[in-house]
Each structure stands twice: as structure tokens, then as C-alpha cells.
Regions:
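Interaction-mediating elements
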Residues: 1-130
Length: 130
């Protein structure tokens, strides 16, 4: 039997989360506010999307932890990477989007960006003072 799984994350802001998901080309469904599971069951979410392999995923705000939780039916997970790797990739891009946004607000510019062999991203920033 299948059921929905809720996985805690450290994702606290919607804008960098949506930018991270868009970066990977995941199509966010602005109309649907639910995820479909086994035998047509539904659960409410704040952000819903379809991954390749007809995997449905959502993010739901958890007021207790002040962060988004990933919601999906793991028994129906057919995406090419495991859910743990998916969360890791989204979390890394969320952090990247957050850093870029905050540093640009503070007047910094990216001088150099290196995508390392270990999957990390190295940024060199500069700020010109007047």
C-alpha cells in the first residue's frame, strides 16, 4: 500500500526555491495545489510539480519548523535519481540562488564561478566602493 511521505528540508523562502526548481527545468504547476498518490489519493501542497517519469512532488509550508517540506508518494517515485539526491540538488541550487540574491542586494558582482568535480560551486565576488 502506498502513502504520502513528508521529508523535512531547510528551505525557508519561496523565491529561491522556485528559482532553484526552474533552474533544473522542473515545471511548477501554479494551478494545482495538490499532489496525487496511490489510487487517486490527493494531499494539499503549496507548490506542486511533475517530474519526468510521471512523478508528482510538492512542497508544503510547515509552520512548526518554519520551512518547506517535500511531499510525494515514494512508492510512485519513478524519477531517474533517488529522492535524497533530488533534495540535495534542489537544496544546493536554493543556497546558490539565495547567495546570489543577497550579494547582489549588497552590491556585489560575480567575478568568477567554478563548478567543481565534487559537485560544489565556487564563487568569487567583488564589490566596488565609490
Amino acid at each position: 500500500m502506498s502513502h504520502f511521505s513528508t521529508i523535512k528540508t531547510q528551505l525557508k523562502e519561496v523565491e529561491p526555491l522556485i528559482k532553484a526548481l526552474n533552474h533544473f527545468g522542473y515545471s511548477i504547476n501554479q494551478e494545482e495545489k495538490f499532489v496525487k498518490g496511490y489510487k487517486g489519493q490527493f494531499t494539499a501542497v503549496d507548490i506542486s510539480m511533475h517530474l519526468p517519469g510521471d512523478t508528482q512532488v510538492g512542497f508544503k509550508w510547515d509552520k512548526n519548523s518554519n520551512s518547506y517540506e517535500l511531499v510525494t508518494d515514494l512508492d510512485l517515485w519513478k524519477f531517474e535519481i533517488p529522492v535524497e539526491r533530488f533534495i540535495s540538488k534542489v537544496t544546493q541550487m536554493y543556497a546558490y540562488q539565495t547567495i546570489i540574491s543577497k550579494t547582489q542586494e549588497d552590491g556585489y558582482q560575480i567575478v568568477e564561478q567554478k563548478n567543481k568535480n565534487d559537485g560544489s560551486i565556487e564563487l568569487v565576488l567583488t564589490k566596488w566602493e565609490n
